[in-house]
Amino acid sequence: DRLRTGILIGADIIAVLIPILCVSRFQLILAAALAVITYLMMDIHIDPLQMIISAAVLFVGLLAAYIILTIARSHDVEYLNGIFEMKNSRTPIFVTQPYMYIANNYDNFDCMVRAMASGYSHSFGLKMLFPLWALTGLKFLVPSLTAFPLFTTKEELTTVTLFYDAYYDFGILGVVLLGCVLGLLAWYLTDMVKHIRNPIGYLLYAQIAVYFGLSFFTTWFSNPTTWFYLAVTGAAAVYGEWRQ
């Protein structure tokens, strides 16, 4: 029992240290969100007072880590607020950054839609298939597969929304089709979670939940990292079910 507890504590410490050592605020938030959702989905009885205290401690800890990582990334607050065109250049970055990422990402989507309307050609599936080109190395052998301009309002702000690549590929039809596929995925996961018997299954559910919840942040399902995470988690979930 002590060995098992020690291994679990060590794994938790490593999981927290990885995003900190990578100086990645998003990875830190993602790790915390996955842990919280997985824990809540496991239907473990939690005292309300204990839950409130834990949530407060987690929030304060994440906020402190976010600020520290922002400083570690050498992000000057006034410089970033200048890019965001904030009226008050001294507004705390942890207040302006999340809001401006959301607002600017939809501005980037609008910028791309206007570019398509002005005569740029759609990519007809090549953008959404970027994980295939990246994970197989084809993007290096055939550079034309990924040679598409990124339409953004500012050179420094390159994050986009979930539907960016879908519209880039097929316009409104691409957005509708992706929405239908994601809707079916949500229905399947909602049904699947009723029959899950191991924590890894809940972790897989939590990953999709985070991707849906942060749909304004990036094109999750045309990102190679997303599919790598899903493949590893899915394999672990299948192995866990097999062991049981």
Regions found by a protein language model. Name each.
Residues 1, 41, 113-116, 167, ...:
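Hydrophobic residues in alpha-helical segments
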Residues 1-4, 22-23, 148-149, 195-201:
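Short, amphipathic, aromatic/basic-enriched membrane-interface segments that mark the entry/exit
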Residues 1, 85, 101-108, 189-193, ...:
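Charged, low-complexity, helix-prone segments enriched in Lys/Glu/Asp/Gln
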Residues 62-182:
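Small-residue-enriched transmembrane helix-hairpin modules in multi-pass membrane proteins
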Residues 2-89:
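Hydrophobic alpha-helical segments of polytopic membrane proteins
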Residues 155-244:
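Hydrophobic alpha-helical segments
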Residues 19-25, 132-136, 216-217:
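Membrane-interface helix-loop junctions at the exits of transmembrane helices
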Residues 45-46, 149, 230:
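General N-terminal targeting signals
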